[in-house]
């Protein structure tokens, strides 16, 4: 493993530890409890893990491991009713018939995560990839590569 890749993996591991130790569920009963946290990494051709399972108050964070590529986590618009909050900002916004995340780059220090807990169930989503790592730069509405994955909320 190159030094650059080792440094990136170390940073991701440290960020994951900080996020999982600092995230709380908020709200009334059980306020202050640590939310179960899952990290999903993606690159040009793979999502790891493709299926992630979290408890009802859990959360997911996405990390882009593909240099020079922008990724967008994309949910169908009908997922909005499954969220425990009405506003999916700042991480997701509605665009047509989908909710699309902020762009996720390999160099971006901000993370994209679920804005609030999802109801129990299984939710498919896509990761749209664009950028020079896949060829020419293109618009977010025209992904050059689409990866598919799933979240299972227990």
Language model segments and positions:
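C-terminal motif of bacterial Sec signal peptides marking the signal peptidase cleavage site
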Residues: 17-20
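N-terminal edge beta-strand
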Residues: 30-61
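Short aromatic-acidic-glycine turn motif
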Residues: 79-90
């Amino acid at each position: 493993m190159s030094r650059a890749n080792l440094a990136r993996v170390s940073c991701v591991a440290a960020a994951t530890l900080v996020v999982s130790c600092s995230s709380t569920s908020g709200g009334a009963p059980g306020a202050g409890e640590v939310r179960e946290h899952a990290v999903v990494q993606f690159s040009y051709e793979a999502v790891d893990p493709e299926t992630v399972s979290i408890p009802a108050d859990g959360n997911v964070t996405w990390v882009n491991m593909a240099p020079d590529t922008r990724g967008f986590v994309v949910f169908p618009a009908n997922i909005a009713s499954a969220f425990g909050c009405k506003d999916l900002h700042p991480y997701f916004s509605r665009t047509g018939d989908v909710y699309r995340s902020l762009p996720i780059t390999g160099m971006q220090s901000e993370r994209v995560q679920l804005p609030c807990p999802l109801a129990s169930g299984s939710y498919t989503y896509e990761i749209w990839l664009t950028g020079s790592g896949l060829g020419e730069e293109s618009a977010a509405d025209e992904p050059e590569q689409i990866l598919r994955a799933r979240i299972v909320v227990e």
